[in-house]
């Protein structure tokens, strides 16, 4: 195997990280010469990054092929018409890069490829006998991120492995989904990631069920609620919990209005002279679900989770109502709102409030509130419905056992979806089943962010000196360097490099005319798993210095054994 010489390689290391780099992976990828920024959320991948990304793609490809996946390569440029068939041309909004051709035709740059793969299935699949099918690609995607940041964690151009399964029924989908789940676990394990699979919100993808694969790191932007006792885990967009029951008084026979001039926040109502604890207040929020008003009600000290509201309403898009949209509907401004006996829009109440009595809420009249509200009597009896709305908090009870939930930041590296017939119905992709009936194809969608795996691995595996790469995705397995300018050291190092190459070990040969300290620092920064140093004293005894990047002590290894030792280390870490 051919070694790469440092003097011929392009490895533009830096002593300092960019001032705008906040997370470890961003700092180290720039300092170690893996990436450079071209624009906001747009990066050049330099040779070291390309080597690691190619290895990640190879692992993904192997595991996809192992479950019967067939690789495609589809266009990144999509005509608008195909996205309009599924209804997502409008739903994607500003997140999609859009352009017109010279004839005025509308196009989008693909964020994902459900529509394109569904169109192929519609045009080519005719019978249940052709199913199941598992199709995938590793392709460039585009997303117009409003706030690109954190290096490779939030970008506008990225590489995704997106796979799609096509089955004749739900049972087939269940099997395809499980196959993908197991393949994902193998991929992330091989890439050196410590991950957890969690229940997740499907968002604009749609479908009945989805799971995210999360890496626990403070660099993540998602929040996961997990129980250390029973291993329940879910994104806070879907997580549920047990909350302690409140001992309410009997309340009043009917809600009673009282003046609250200038009181427009939960916190203000907690203060004297009213002194109403937040847990006894009903927080009433006005949202637009697919541009239709919906009223969400949670406890005063709880936060509404917009993803849960989207699930509860079945809407494609939810947003807070604008300030000017609220008074015509509610009769008051924000801060004085309530849902007591309200029937002008759909009202959704969090289940934790179902049996609450003697509550306080806005009176839908500026400067007034209502006390003595009985949720069941005054809201549910008038058409309000129950649905999970609140965001769970750390310390609340696990919904599956007696344990307490912890909540932590996490980074999503993969997401799998049971799409069902969402796309096949809207795009009329059907096959004949065994009974001769035309049925919509049952689909699944499965995505992995390739660059995110690289960044996540670095977030998990680094120290004060640099990257500590897992062997399977390191740009090189080993680096060989000399500890002096003497010709005999160079000659011995060349022999070591050649022996390593014969054993299939990928080598970066640091042949620079630099001090040993500089070479050691760069080796640590680059994170190459094995370091072999050839020095005058060791060579006189027939030895070289051996050190593992992951916390290993320096060992003396006989010159003739180092290649075998390295090959064994590589095999042990990659098989």
From Swiss-Prot:
NCBIfam families: PRK09194.1 (NF006625), proS_fam_II (TIGR00409). Its EC number is 6.1.1.15. Homodimer. Keywords: Aminoacyl-tRNA synthetase, ATP-binding, Cytoplasm, Ligase, Nucleotide-binding, Protein biosynthesis. Consists of three domains: the N-terminal catalytic domain, the editing domain and the C-terminal anticodon-binding domain. It catalyses: tRNA(Pro) + L-proline + ATP = L-prolyl-tRNA(Pro) + AMP + diphosphate. It holds the Pfam family tRNA-synt_2b. GO terms for molecular function: aminoacyl-tRNA deacylase activity; ATP binding; proline-tRNA ligase activity. The keyword Transport does not apply. Coiled coil: none annotated. This is Proline--tRNA ligase 1. CDD domains: ProRS-INS, ProRS_anticodon_short, ProRS_core_prok. It is found in: Cytoplasm. One of its GO terms (biological process) is prolyl-tRNA aminoacylation. Catalyzes the attachment of proline to tRNA(Pro) in a two-step reaction: proline is first activated by ATP to form Pro-AMP and then transferred to the acceptor end of tRNA(Pro). As ProRS can inadvertently accommodate and process non-cognate amino acids such as alanine and cysteine, to avoid such errors it has two additional distinct editing activities against alanine. One activity is designated as 'pretransfer' editing and involves the tRNA(Pro)-independent hydrolysis of activated Ala-AMP. Belongs to the class-II aminoacyl-tRNA synthetase family. ProS type 1 subfamily. InterPro entries: aa-tRNA-synt_IIb (IPR002314), aa-tRNA-synth_II (IPR006195), aa-tRNA-synth_II/BPL/LPL (IPR045864), Anticodon-bd (IPR004154), Anticodon-bd_dom_sf (IPR036621), Pro-tRNA-ligase_IIa (IPR002316), Pro-tRNA-synth_IIa_bac-type (IPR004500), Pro-tRNA-Synthase_IIa_type1 (IPR023717).
């Amino acid at each position: 195997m051919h070694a790469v010489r440092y003097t011929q390689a392009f490895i533009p290391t830096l002593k300092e990280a960019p001032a705008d780099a906040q997370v470890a992976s961003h700092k180290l990828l720039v300092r170690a010469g893996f990436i450079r920024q071209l624009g906001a959320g747009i990066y050049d991948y330099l040779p070291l990054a390309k080597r690691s990304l190619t290895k990640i793609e190879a692992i993904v490809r192997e595991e996809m092929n192992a479950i019967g996946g067939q690789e495609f390569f589809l266009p990144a440029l999509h005509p608008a018409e195909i996205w309009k068939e599924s209804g997502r041309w409008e739903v994607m909004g500003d997140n999609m890069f859009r352009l017109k051709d010279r004839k005025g035709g509308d196009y989008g740059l693909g964020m994902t490829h459900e529509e394109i793969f569904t169109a192929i299935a519609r045009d080519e699949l005719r019978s249940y006998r052709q199913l199941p099918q598992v199709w995938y690609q590793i392709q460039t995607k585009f997303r117009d991120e409003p706030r690109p940041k954190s290096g490779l964690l939030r970008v506008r151009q990225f590489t995704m492995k997106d796979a799609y399964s096509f089955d004749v029924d739900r049972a087939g989908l269940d099997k395809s989904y499980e196959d993908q789940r197991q393949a994902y676990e193998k991929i992330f394990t091989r890439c050196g990631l410590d991950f957890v699979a969690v229940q997740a919100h499907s968002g604009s993808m749609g479908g009945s069920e989805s799971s995210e694969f999360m890496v626990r790191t403070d660099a993540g932007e998602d929040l996961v609620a997990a129980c250390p006792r029973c291993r329940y885990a879910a994104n806070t967009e879907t997580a549920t919990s047990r909350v302690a029951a409140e001992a309410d008084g009997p309340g009043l026979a009917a809600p009673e209005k009282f003046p609250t001039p200038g009181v427009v926040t939960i916190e203000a109502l907690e203060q004297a002279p009213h002194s109403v604890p937040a847990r006894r207040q009903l927080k009433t929020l006005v949202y637009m679900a697919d541009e239709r008003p919906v009223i969400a009600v949670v406890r005063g000290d709880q936060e509404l989770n917009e993803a849960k509201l989207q699930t509860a309403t079945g809407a494609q898009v939810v947003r807070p109502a604008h300030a000017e949209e609220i008074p015509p509907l509610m009769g008051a401004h924000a801060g004085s709102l309530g849902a007591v006996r309200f029937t002008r829009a759909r009202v959704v109440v969090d289940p934790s409030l179902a049996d609450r009595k003697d509550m306080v809420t806005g009176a839908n009249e500026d400067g007034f509130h209502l006390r003595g509200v009985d949720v069941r009597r005054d809201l549910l009896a008038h058409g309000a419905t129950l649905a999970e709305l609140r965001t769970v908090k750390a310390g609340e009870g696990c919904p599956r056992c007696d344990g307490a939930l912890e909540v932590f930041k996490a980074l999503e590296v993969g997401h799998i979806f049971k799409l069902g017939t969402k796309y096949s119905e809207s795009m009329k992709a059907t096959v004949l089943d065994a009974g001769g009936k035309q049925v919509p194809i049952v689909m699944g969608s499965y995505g992995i962010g390739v660059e995110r795996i690289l960044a996540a691995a670095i977030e998990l595996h680094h120290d004060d000196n640099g990257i500590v790469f897992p062997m399977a995705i390191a740009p090189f397995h080993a680096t060989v360097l000399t500890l002096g300018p003497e010709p005999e050291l160079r000659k011995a190092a060349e022999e070591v490099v050649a022996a390593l190459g014969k054993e299939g070990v990928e080598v970066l040969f640091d042949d620079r005319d630099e001090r040993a300290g500089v070479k050691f620092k760069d080796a640590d920064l680059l994170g190459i798993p094995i370091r072999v140093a050839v020095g005058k004293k060791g060579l006189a005894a027939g030895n070289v210095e051996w050190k593992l990047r992951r916390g290993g002590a320096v060992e003396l290894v006989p010159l003739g054994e180092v290649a075998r030792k390295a090959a064994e280390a590589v095999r042990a870490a990659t098989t």
